[in-house]
């Protein structure tokens, strides 16, 4: 890679890289169970960190990352791409303005018909082994939809979680053996928050179904479907369904309201925050609660009952991989 892109400096030891005093920030783009040790080492070395999703391979490790961020006074940004779509921006403005009224239920839906990494033909085998990934469909894709809803709702604290995970459909036996496939391809859950708010979670890497309807938000005055974005309400006692001109919104933001563009893409937002042009969105906090929900579904499935968020916090353990010669 260094030769291909003419990168002059290359390292075999991450600690040596982090000793450089001319580096302000690093990007951690590794397998999930490597996120925590490298991120923590970078934060302790005085660097700001941009980390891939999910935050870590377990809630325990994600929390350690968050604590280190606070301790070191550095920025930690998690790649939560769905926070920066125009759909999300429009929905956020409507929710903050009270257009939906009291929000009481949301649905987080992610769908692939036959899209399991490696066994269905793309991606590396580490995606489907918990020793490297920590989880399956929930960790890989569910993180986007759950975090999007948490952001829109103001990142409420989960109270109770119930759910089940599944691996039911056939796959290539040779690739199953090579990858040691041991993660879920489908997950379903229900999350309770304060004041009666609930979240339904459905996430599929592989399912015999032609489509899911996508994520949605239900309020006392109106409801939103998020992709494609539509608004549903009663107007003068008549049912109304409305769509949005996203292309016009994109054009107007890029020409008239150019300052909004720092919130339209994760890395652009990160760079702007590093340059002091905008405050960083609380992606670390949102990703931490997302991880709590995901691990809660796993724990609930193992115990076949609803669990509290406190149980998840107390039982979560580190599954970080050992990295030789890494100091943190």
How would you label these PLM feature ranges?
Residues 255, 272-289:
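Glycine- and charged-residue-rich phosphate/anionic-cofactor binding loop of Rossmann-like
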Residues 5-68:
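Beta-loop-alpha module in the N-terminal Rossmann-like domain of NAD(P)-dependent dehydrogenases
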Residues 1-2:
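Conserved SAM-binding loop
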Residues 74-75, 101-105, 299-328:
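C-terminal capping/lid region of NAD(P)-dependent oxidoreductase domains
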Residues 147-238, 264-280, 295, 310-328:
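Contiguous beta-strand/loop segments that form the cofactor/metal-binding neighborhood of enzyme cores
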Residues 75, 82-180, 304:
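Predominantly a Rossmann-like dinucleotide-binding segment in NAD(P)-dependent oxidoreductases
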Residues 11, 51, 76-78, 201, ...:
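Hydrophobic residues in well-ordered beta-strands that form the structural core
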């Amino acid at each position: 890679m260094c030769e291909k892109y003419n990168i002059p400096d290359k390292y075999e030891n991450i600690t040596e890289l982090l000793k450089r005093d001319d580096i302000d920030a690093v990007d951690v783009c590794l397998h999930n169970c490597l996120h925590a040790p490298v991120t923590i080492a970078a934060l302790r070395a005085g660097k700001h960190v941009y980390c891939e999703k999910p935050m870590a391979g377990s809630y325990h490790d994600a929390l350690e990352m968050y604590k280190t961020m606070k301790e070191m006074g550095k920025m930690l940004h998690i790649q939560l791409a769905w926070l920066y779509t125009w759909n999300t921006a429009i929905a956020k403005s409507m929710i903050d303005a009270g257009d939906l009224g009291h929000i009481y239920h949301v649905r987080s839906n992610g769908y692939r018909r036959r899209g399991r990494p490696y066994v269905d033909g793309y991606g590396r085998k580490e995606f489907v082994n918990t020793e490297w990934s920590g989880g399956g469909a929930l960790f890989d894709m569910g993180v986007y939809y759950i975090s999007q809803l948490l952001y829109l709702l103001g990142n409420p604290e989960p109270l109770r979680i119930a759910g089940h995970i599944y691996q039911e459909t056939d796959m290539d036996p040779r690739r199953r053996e090579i990858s040691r496939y041991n993660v879920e391809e489908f997950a379903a859950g229900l999350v309770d928050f304060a004041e009666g708010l609930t979240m339904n979670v459905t996430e599929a890497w592989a399912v015999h179904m032609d489509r899911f309807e996508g994520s949605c938000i239900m309020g006392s005055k109106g409801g939103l479907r998020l992709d494609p974005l539509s608004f549903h309400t009663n107007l003068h006692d008549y049912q109304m369904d409305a769509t949005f001109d996203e292309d016009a919104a994109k054009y107007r933001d890029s020409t008239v309201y150019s300052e909004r563009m720092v919130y339209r893409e994760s890395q652009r937002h990160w760079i702007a925050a590093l340059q002091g042009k905008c405050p960083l969105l609380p992606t670390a906090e949102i990703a931490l609660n997302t991880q709590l929900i995901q691990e809660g579904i796993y724990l609930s499935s193992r115990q076949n009952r609803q669990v509290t968020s406190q149980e998840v916090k107390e039982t979560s353990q580190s599954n970080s991989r050992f990295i030789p010669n890494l100091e943190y």
